[in-house]
Amino acid sequence: ETGLSSDPVMNWKLSALDCYTMISNSDAHSPQKLGREANLFDTDLTYNAMFEALKTRQGFLGTFEFFPEGGKYHMDGHRKCGICLDPTATQAYKGLCPVCSKPLTVGVLHRVEELADRPQPRQPEGAPNFEYLIPLPEILSEIKSASPNSKVVQQQFWQIIGAFGNEFTFLRKVPLEDIQQHLGQVFAEAIRRLRNQQVCLTPGYDGLYGTIHVFQPGELQQLNGQRSLRATNANPPVAAAYSSKDTYQI
């Protein structure tokens, strides 16, 4: 299991792991975060079928991954002093905080580099692929400058789910032109960047979550100036429907 602070690519630097199937699970103690990482099966949804898929990699299609930089222990650092370092810098400072000289908290990336026997990741033969995803409420949160748990974000989240289907389908499959038509240019651009992994990452360290954004600071204001997000949302959805013909009604 890769955990939030690592991904398959990081683990592909360790040849000893080539024989294992990488899985990615979510935090069961936080219902709203279920599916932040997930495993994709094409099997019967039974224990025996899923276990066999993990052993043989037949019927196991891969994982949905949280960007590892968003994890609390991806990089090395000292939270109290605001110090975040990569493994090379940590070695240069002999494992000590350059501000207070106390020991740095070593992150997952550092540990991977210590154990790695490959200079570059190499995908093992038969290993499934994976996709990076950002939870839809977090994308809405960035666009609307509100908490993921705020009323305005949650309201639009459920409207989108009602219109387009489940969250994975919306993030991965719904055509961008449909998203732009019903939710506006800014939203479509956010999903396009996610699908192309064009995101802004500030890594987490020493128990501090990293940040993942799809827009640069100030960029939203510029895009909204081109096509007002307020105008896009002036008439909020009052009904939602999804059909097998890929028609959406918001």
Task: Name each model feature, range by range.
Residues E1-I250:
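Charged catalytic cores and adjacent phosphate/nucleic-acid-binding surfaces used
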